[in-house]
């Protein structure tokens, strides 16, 4: 088994075939594949991953400052904290700053789409709509 070191996981940024985001090629010592990332107004980060690991690979990190919604299209492995099996069509939500550790199995493509939503954006949005909801509720109550 090999453990991924975040400072050498991506070896280069590759030419982007579309005008948005950045493509990264992974280090051949871990496998083959790429990751595409696009940040939208500092509120959302969208990532598409297509990687095939060479051997059992452990990945560990902390989730960023926002909520992450991940759809695993294909893949095989195990996540810890809490334990969950990674298999095709798995949908997972990670909390901000959640500890993350997973083991991915080799030669099975890990295809995943994630959307990270900034916590501050969520808080601001909920505050805005709660004020609107209070005004609507108050108006509705007065009318009856």
Ranges and model annotations:
Residues 18-24:
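OB/S1-fold single-stranded nucleic-acid-binding modules
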Residues 1-15:
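Short Lys/Arg-enriched alpha/beta "domain-start" segment
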Residues 139-144:
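Conserved small/polar residues in nucleotide/adenosyl-binding loops
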Residues 25-137:
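N-terminal regulatory/effector-sensing and dimerization cores
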């Amino acid at each position: 088994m090999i453990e991924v070191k975040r400072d050498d996981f991506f070896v280069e940024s590759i030419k982007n075939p579309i005008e948005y985001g950045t493509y990264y090629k992974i280090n051949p010592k871990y496998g083959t594949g790429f990751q595409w990332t696009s940040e939208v107004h500092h509120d959302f980060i969208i990532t598409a991953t297509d990687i095939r690991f060479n051997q059992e690979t452990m990945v560990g990190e902390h989730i960023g400052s926002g909520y992450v919604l991940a759809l695993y299209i294909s893949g095989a492995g195990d996540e810890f904290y809490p334990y969950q099996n990674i298999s095709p069509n798995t949908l997972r939500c990670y909390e901000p700053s959640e500890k993350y550790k997973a083991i991915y199995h080799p030669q099975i493509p890990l295809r995943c789409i994630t959307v990270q939503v900034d916590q501050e954006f969520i808080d601001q949005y909920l505050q805005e709509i709660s004020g609107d909801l209070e005004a609507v509720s108050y108006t509705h109550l007065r009318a009856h």
